[in-house]
């Protein structure tokens, strides 16, 4: 097995070590292997391939980090073909929340989410994706 080196803030490393202890992992390497597998499999859901999808991406960052807001604006324009809507709000006193509503293929949405994740100084990134053509029980009600 290869050995790799990763740079990260001390606070994050402490949280990972605590997570490993709390959940019975043998060490942080096991946590990183599982997290890496999950990340790689995240957009490999065969049920979503070749379907039109809708998605929501939420990004939270500190108000002082204007480079994040600039990057969000750049990504919004770069991916205007899939960004159906975008909302910016100030929350919690000194944080900003950017919300993107997306419509596109699995590949285009995963590319967008990947670029958001690669943005430095974000505090949290969350998203969800649903097929446009399948609303399950909701579709049957109409």
Swiss-Prot record:
In which family does this protein belong, per the annotation? Answer: Belongs to the transcriptional regulatory CopG/NikR family.
Q: Which GO terms describe its biological process?
A: response to nickel cation
InterPro entries from the UniProt entry: Acetolactate_synth/TF_NikR_C, ACT-like_dom_sf, Arc_rbn_hlx_hlx, CopG, CopG/NikR_regulator, Ni_resp_reg_NikR, Ribbon_hlx_hlx, TF_NikR_Ni-bd_C
Q: Which cofactor does it need?
A: Ni(2+)
Q: What is this protein called?
A: Putative nickel-responsive regulator
- Cofactor: binding comment: Binds 1 nickel ion per subunit.
Q: Which keywords does this chain's UniProt record carry?
A: DNA-binding, Metal-binding, Nickel, Transcription, Transcription regulation
Q: Name one Pfam family in it.
A: NikR_C
Role of this protein: Transcriptional regulator.
| PANTHER family documented for this protein | NICKEL-RESPONSIVE REGULATOR, NICKEL-RESPONSIVE REGULATOR-RELATED
Instruction: Tell me which species this is from.
Output: Haloquadratum walsbyi (strain DSM 16790 / HBSQ001)
